[in-house]
């Protein structure tokens, strides 16, 4: 008789099935989230839940979405975007060199689209591009649609709301001139190749879910992809301990500059 699947065995099966290695996440937090889903679907044990994931594509999509923590909002944490608009972007665009921006863990696209709006107001002679990546293909599909409920637009400045959104049937549709400036791509931050030559990288509210060892590994890889003088922005509730170890210098809360 086969032994009942435990959490370690479940992690192994999930990694093989969807490529997500749960061992990099904080165990207590991740187990709690999985157990919440199991209760919702009335799965008494890991074996039962795994069968559900294998048999029902909707449950699997919900599982992937739930574990990859897809929360997003346009211009979330307004102080960060004020710093971007007033200081960081003008400094990076000085001299007319092309600007490469990467939004990692972009969720439904609110962050990279917010960046594209800010960049569209800079000197029109400046060249820039925004890359947005996420693990969840279903979320990326929603991001490419550019269709949002009103509650995600709470912090959108009025000038951007009027210029770049059209309301239909209670939803807000993003104008194609902004949508077309963002390139979306699926990426597993734990295993896939990282971008290089970036001037600005944002990975916000992602590190809090990982173990300390994984956090440090990701920060090191992000820093390697950043040009000297470029900026790295994390979540306002996150912090990089000893940023100099990674060649970073703290500029403001959640904002770091690569110094070497």
Segments and roles (model prediction):
Residues 2-102:
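Conserved AdoMet
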Residues 84, 201, 226:
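Residue-level signal for inorganic ion chemistry
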Residues 96-109, 128-131:
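Conserved class I S-adenosyl-L-methionine
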Residues 108-123:
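Conserved SAM-binding loop of SAM-dependent methyltransferases across substrates and taxa
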Residues 128-202, 206-217, 239-241, 260:
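Extended basic-aromatic, gly/pro-enriched interface segments that bind polyanionic ligands
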Residues 216-228:
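A short glycine-rich, Lys/Arg-flanked "PGG" loop and its adjoining helix->strand segment in the class I
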Residues 228-236:
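Conserved beta-strand signature within the Rossmann-like core of class I S-adenosyl-L-methionine
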Residues 251-256:
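Short hydrophobic/aromatic beta-strand or adjacent loop that forms the aromatic wall/cage
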């Amino acid at each position: 008789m086969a032994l009942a699947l435990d959490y370690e065995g479940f992690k192994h099966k999930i990694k093989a099935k969807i490529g997500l290695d749960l061992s990099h996440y904080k165990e207590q937090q991740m187990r709690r989230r999985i157990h919440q889903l199991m209760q919702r679907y009335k799965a008494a044990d890991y074996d039962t839940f795994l069968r559900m994931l294998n048999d029902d594509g909707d449950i699997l999509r919900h599982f992937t979405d739930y574990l990859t923590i897809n929360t997003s909002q346009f211009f979330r944490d307004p102080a960060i975007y004020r710093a971007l608009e007033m200081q960081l972007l003008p400094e990076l665009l000085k001299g007319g060199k092309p600007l490469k921006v990467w939004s990692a863990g972009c969720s439904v696209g609110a962050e990279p689209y917010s960046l594209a709006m800010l960049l569209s107001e800079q000197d029109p002679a400046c060249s820039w591009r925004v890359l947005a990546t996420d693990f969840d293909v279903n979320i990326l599909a929603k991001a490419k649609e550019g269709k949002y409920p009103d509650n995600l637009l709470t912090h959108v400045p009025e000038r951007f709301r009027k210029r770049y959104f059209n309301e239909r049937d209670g939803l807000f549709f993003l104008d194609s001139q902004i949508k077309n400036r963002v390139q979306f791509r699926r990426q597993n931050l734990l295993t896939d190749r990282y971008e290089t030559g970036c001037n600005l990288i944002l990975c916000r509210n992602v590190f809090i879910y990982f173990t300390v060892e994984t956090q440090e590994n990701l920060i090191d890889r992000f820093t390697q992809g950043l040009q000297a003088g470029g900026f790295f922005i994390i979540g306002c509730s996150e912090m990089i301990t000893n940023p100099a170890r990674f060649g970073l210098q703290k500029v403001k809360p959640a904002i770091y500059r690569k110094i070497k």
